[in-house]
């Protein structure tokens, strides 16, 4: 497989996957190993069962997570990109200590226990898993879906290293983000979120079809589409923009409860309206942090009061 270049320097997934080691750690991955168009060992990334097996192998090999599973048709996230978000958040909240020879931050913020809130933790619980195992952070993960909460809780209870480090809370009002989750006297160093991208199921399906058609170089039809992700993981009324505008507005009421508010922004065109909203809000600072994975660029929007 081609190298996944430009990941964060602390990301364990820089370079090529070591499939020999991964299949040794998780033998069920072997049946999904293929030779790609470049003649190198890989898997079929359009096969959700193969991606799920790869995730299990990576979680065992890199993070010591022996049990991880998700319900059928729930989002199976690419772990390298999820890890990047965690590492860039670490840079955001750690003391500004730099290596004189490279100018790069080298300190890892595990001197004290940081507390994080993951909005939309999902059934996969990936951000809390990586944040806890890499940095020792504790997490609260919220979600509007009871199945996701129950599955994430099972992952935590089945891995002793995560026990008492990750708490799951059900958001009972789908119109709210922080309200009903953050208690009045509770404090988080940072909040994370990977919001739903799309405004409807149809838009989500069409977007996935276009992406797959582009990657495969030929038209992909709905009959051939393996659509990964539950409804609330992929779309919400008003899409990403409305969700994040609501988040910014709600964050004003929790300025004393959170050090940094952050979210991924998948659509670059939304940044203009989001930054305008932030500038009209009495924040102290906002940042846009770019992340690179091969030819893909994604962004973290961060702000604090």
Swiss-Prot record:
UniProt-recorded name of the protein: Ribosomal RNA large subunit methyltransferase F
Family in the record: Belongs to the methyltransferase superfamily. METTL16/RlmF family.
EC number of this enzyme: 2.1.1.181
Keywords on record: Cytoplasm, Methyltransferase, rRNA processing, S-adenosyl-L-methionine, Transferase
NCBIfam families: PRK11727.1 (NF008725)
Localization per Swiss-Prot or TrEMBL: Cytoplasm
GO molecular-function terms, A-Z: 23S rRNA (adenine(1618)-N(6))-methyltransferase activity
SUPFAM superfamilies, sorted: S-adenosyl-L-methionine-dependent methyltransferases
Keyword Nucleotidyltransferase set for record: no
Catalytic reaction(s) noted: adenosine(1618) in 23S rRNA + S-adenosyl-L-methionine = N(6)-methyladenosine(1618) in 23S rRNA + S-adenosyl-L-homocysteine + H(+)
Gene Ontology CC annotation, any one: cytoplasm
One Pfam family linked to the record: Methyltransf_10
Primary role: Specifically methylates the adenine in position 1618 of 23S rRNA.
Gene: rlmF
Keyword S-adenosyl-L-methionine appears in the UniProt entry: yes
Biological source species: Bacteroides fragilis (strain YCH46)
Biological process annotations from GO: rRNA base methylation
């Amino acid at each position: 497989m081609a190298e996944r270049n430009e990941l964060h320097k602390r990301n364990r997934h820089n370079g090529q996957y070591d499939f020999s080691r991964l299949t040794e750690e998780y033998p069920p991955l072997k049946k999904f190993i293929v030779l790609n168009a470049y003649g190198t060992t890989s898997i079929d990334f359009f096969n959700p069962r193969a991606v799920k097996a790869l995730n299990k192998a990576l979680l065992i090999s890199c993070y010591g997570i022996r049990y991880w599973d998700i319900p059928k048709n729930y989002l199976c996230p690419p772990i390298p990109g999820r890890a990047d978000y965690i590492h860039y958040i670490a840079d955001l909240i750690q003391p500004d200590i730099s290596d004189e020879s490279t100018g790069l931050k080298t300190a890892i913020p595990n001197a004290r226990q940081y507390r994080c809130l993951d909005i939309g933790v999902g059934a996969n619980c990936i951000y809390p898993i990586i944040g806890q195992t890499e940095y020792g952070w504790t997490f609260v993960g919220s979600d509007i879906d009871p199945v996701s909460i129950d599955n994430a809780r099972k992952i935590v209870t089945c891995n002793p290293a995560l026990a008492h480090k990750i708490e799951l809370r059900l958001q009972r009002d789908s119109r709210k983000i922080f309200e009903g989750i953050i208690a009045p006297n509770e404090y988080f160093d940072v909040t994370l979120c990977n919001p739903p991208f799309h405004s409807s199921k149809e838009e989500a399906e069409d977007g996935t079809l276009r992406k797959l058609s582009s990657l495969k170089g030929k038209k992909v039809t709905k009959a051939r589409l393996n659509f990964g992700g539950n409804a609330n993981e992929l779309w919400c009324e008003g899409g990403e923009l409305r969700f994040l505008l609501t988040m910014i507005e709600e964050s004003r009421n929790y300025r004393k409860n959170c050090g940094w508010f952050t979210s991924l922004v998948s659509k670059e065109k939304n940044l203009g309206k989001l930054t305008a909203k932030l500038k009209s809000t009495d924040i102290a600072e906002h940042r846009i942090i770019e992340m690179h994975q091969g030819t893909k660029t994604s962004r973290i929007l961060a702000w604090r009061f």
